[in-house]
């Protein structure tokens, strides 16, 4: 009896991961009615990550809280928590609080959108005793270097007159000092290089949260390799997609360099502005690296580990994976290549299904990523 594992990413704009998987299962059952089929949703750290983990783990709790949206509006967001060997874990997507779809097209302006709500989500999870965080940082509407998140977590981001800087990339331009409400106990990329703020600068709640944060770990699902600044930095590459015109893009890159200067002049021998992924989500990756000891990791690797998909791969004879488009980019850390890599580790036959096959799909076959590639109107790898 044929045993088939279906683990496909969402077909964006058409089907979620689970919907696509169940559709494939129906087709398999028509052709191979006696086969055993397991459908497992997967994702690469962006849209659908929490859904994939919910399916892959037991005793997952749904959490909700009210946070500040990218335009300063109040909105309700969801995330999940569960107990893991490494400690109580929170899984959240930054796009829930600061995603581009939350901003009407005519109001998109990364000079003013904020990640404050991301910090509020983290703060809520800390209050619920979470100590391990998995955070997807794709799909952002922001370019604020993560200072909104820091402000929500109790950091003082101040201008030359000691006033809080405004939301958004605009705040980076006038930033002169960042004060932490605590000195962390753990090592790594933390904020221990900042002195504790002046008395009265932070509320007791902020200090309590910050002290708990110093013992938290952050695994950041990040699939872009862009640095914080420069030609390939977040401002020049991603800000136009978020509503910035050419003049604003150049100004934001200047502001981002100033932000990095403010941070790094306080750190002897430490700089993450050119670290791959530091420019993710408008510089949010940089904030996680420099202030919270975050580890940037390919999202699919996190999902595969957290969901225990390897057990299902070992069970199967054939593994079917896929996403909306199979092309040269598929091999660069995207969901199908991650699933295929795990399947090949166990000697499984791998079939990829895409909504379409783009340039470079043939390379996925030639380099042995997949045994076959299917799309609606094209097939590769079949004699």
Regions found by a protein language model. Give the residues of each.
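N-terminal loops that bind phosphate or other acidic moieties
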Residues: 2-137, 141-383
């Amino acid at each position: 009896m044929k045993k088939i594992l279906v683990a496909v990413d969402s077909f964006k704009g058409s089907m979620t991961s689970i919907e696509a998987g169940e559709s494939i299962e129906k087709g398999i059952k028509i052709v191979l009615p006696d086969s055993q089929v397991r459908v497992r949703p997967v994702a690469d750290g962006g849209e659908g990550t929490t859904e994939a983990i919910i399916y892959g783990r037991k005793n997952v709790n749904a959490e909700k809280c009210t946070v500040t949206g990218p335009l300063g509006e109040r909105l309700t967001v969801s995330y999940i928590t569960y107990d893991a060997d490494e400690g109580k874990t929170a899984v959240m997507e930054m796009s829930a609080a600061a995603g581009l779809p939350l901003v009407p097209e005519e109001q998109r302006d990364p000079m003013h959108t904020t990640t404050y709500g991301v910090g509020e989500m983290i703060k809520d999870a800390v209050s619920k005793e979470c100590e391990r965080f998995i955070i997807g940082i794709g799909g952002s509407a922001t370019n604020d270097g993560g200072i909104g998140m820091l402000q929500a977590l109790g950091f003082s981001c101040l201008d030359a007159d000691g006033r809080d800087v405004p939301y958004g990339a605009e705040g980076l331009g006038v930033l002169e000092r960042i004060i932490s409400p605590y000195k962390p106990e753990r090592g790594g990329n933390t904020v221990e290089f900042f002195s504790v703020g002046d008395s009265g600068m932070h509320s007791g709640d902020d200090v309590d949260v910050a002290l708990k944060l110093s013992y938290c770990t952050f695994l950041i699902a990040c699939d872009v390799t862009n640095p914080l600044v420069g030609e390939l930095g977040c401002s020049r590459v991603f800000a136009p997609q978020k509503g910035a015109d050419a003049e604003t893009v150049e100004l934001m890159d200047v502001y981002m360099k100033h932000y990095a200067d403010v941070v790094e002049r306080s750190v002897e021998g430490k700089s993450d502005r050119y670290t791959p992924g530091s420019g993710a989500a408008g510089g949010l990756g940089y904030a996680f690296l420099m202030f919270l000891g975050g580890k940037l990791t390919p999202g699919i690797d996190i999902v595969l580990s957290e969901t225990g998909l390897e057990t299902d791969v070992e069970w199967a004879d054939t593994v079917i994976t896929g996403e909306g488009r199979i092309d040269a980019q598929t091999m660069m850390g995207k969901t199908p290549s991650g699933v295929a890599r795990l399947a090949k580790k166990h000697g499984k036959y791998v079939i990829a299904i895409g909504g379409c096959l783009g340039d470079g799909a043939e390379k996925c076959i030639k380099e042995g990523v997949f045994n076959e590639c299917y799309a609606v109107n094209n097939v590769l790898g079949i004699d």
